């Protein structure tokens, strides 16, 4: 399983290619040769459209580097190097403009279909184009599910319950309004308005109604009811440890790779012309102050 966090944790002084190469040397099985690992990195770079920036530094607060979308794709490449069957992403489009976000979702969709990999992502306020790229949707309100099924069927589902938009709007915007109880532009079943409830009570009533309808639907045998027999915890742990040992390099190889990565990352910082000038200037100033 791979997990891509919302904030990209990468070394700013390393290039995109160096980041993925060091990750490959650390995470890919020891039985693979160095050339095979480099070939795997080249394939990932091509798959994620990172060819143009492969020799560009990641960058950070004080280092100019790649764009936000390229940095996010590098983080994704870091995780899919080991070819996980399940990839989780925490709000991958946050902080990206609409064009970069759409390109990223297109790449994720291509990865899911070409490698038959399951990709699960949390996302806020996707555009209409992005929304229609999703296969399945899980909508959560106040920690409880109110819809789980095919993304293209969600509007019909809520319409059958009596919830329809009163103005043309993005399906994702409609769903988020439902989940948060923002019902100004949404028609709701009349029975929920009985007694002219206060706004807060009305929102709570609608959310509770949607949660109850989802539970009823799941209880009637909705999607995902068939379950595989679960392994015992001890068996799962032994299997995970065995798979980890099969994939890991030994501690000395890890030490060598980490040392090389640290030197490569810090050397560019320590040997920066501005830093050298500052160090020499401070040394000369202190030497003159204490000159006898």
Please provide the spans of the model-predicted regions.
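ABC ATPase C-loop
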Residues: 79-80
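ABC ATPase nucleotide-binding domain "signature motif"
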Residues: 50, 56-74, 98
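H-loop (His-switch) and adjacent beta-strand-loop-beta switch element
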Residues: 116, 123-156
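Helical segment within the ABC ATPase nucleotide-binding domain
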Residues: 101-116
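Topological signature of polytopic alpha-helical transporters
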Residues: 5, 22, 27-48, 54, ...
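Conserved catalytic motifs of ABC-family nucleotide-binding domains
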Residues: 7-18, 31-32, 83
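Catalytic Walker B motif of ABC-type/P-loop ATPase nucleotide-binding domains
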Residues: 87-91
């Amino acid at each position: 399983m791979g997990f891509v966090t919302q904030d990209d944790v990468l070394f700013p002084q390393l290039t995109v290619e160096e980041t993925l190469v060091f990750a490959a040397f650390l995470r890919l099985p020891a039985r693979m040769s160095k050339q095979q690992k480099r070939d795997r990195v080249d394939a990932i770079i091509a798959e994620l459209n990172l060819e143009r920036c492969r020799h560009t530094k990641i960058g950070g607060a004080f280092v100019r580097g790649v764009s936000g979308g390229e940095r996010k794709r590098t983080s994704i490449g870091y995780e899919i190097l080991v070819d996980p069957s399940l990839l989780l992403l925490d709000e991958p489009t946050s902080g990206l403009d609409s064009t970069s976000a759409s390109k990223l979702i297109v790449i994720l969709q291509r990865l899911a279909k070409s490698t038959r990999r399951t990709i699960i992502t949390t996302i806020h306020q996707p555009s209409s184009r992005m929304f229609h790229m999703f296969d399945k949707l899980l909508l959560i309100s106040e920690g409880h599910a109110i819809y789980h099924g095919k993304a293209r069927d969600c509007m019909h589902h809520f319409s059958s319950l009596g919830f329809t938009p009163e103005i043309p709007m993005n399906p994702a915007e409609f769903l988020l309004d439902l989940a948060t109880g923002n019902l100004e532009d949404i028609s709701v079943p009349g029975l929920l308005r009985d007694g002219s409830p206060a706004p807060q009570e009305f929102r709570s009533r609608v959310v509770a109604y949607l949660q109850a309808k989802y539970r009823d639907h799941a209880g009637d045998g909705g999607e995902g009811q068939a379950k595989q027999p679960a392994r015992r915890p001890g068996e799962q742990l032994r299997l995970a440890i065995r798979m980890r040992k099969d994939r890991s390099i030994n501690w000395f190889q890890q030490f060598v790779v980490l040392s090389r990565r640290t030197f490569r990352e810090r050397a560019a910082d320590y040997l920066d012309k501005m830093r050298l000038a500052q160090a020499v200037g401070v040394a000369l100033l202190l030497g003159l102050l204490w000159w006898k």
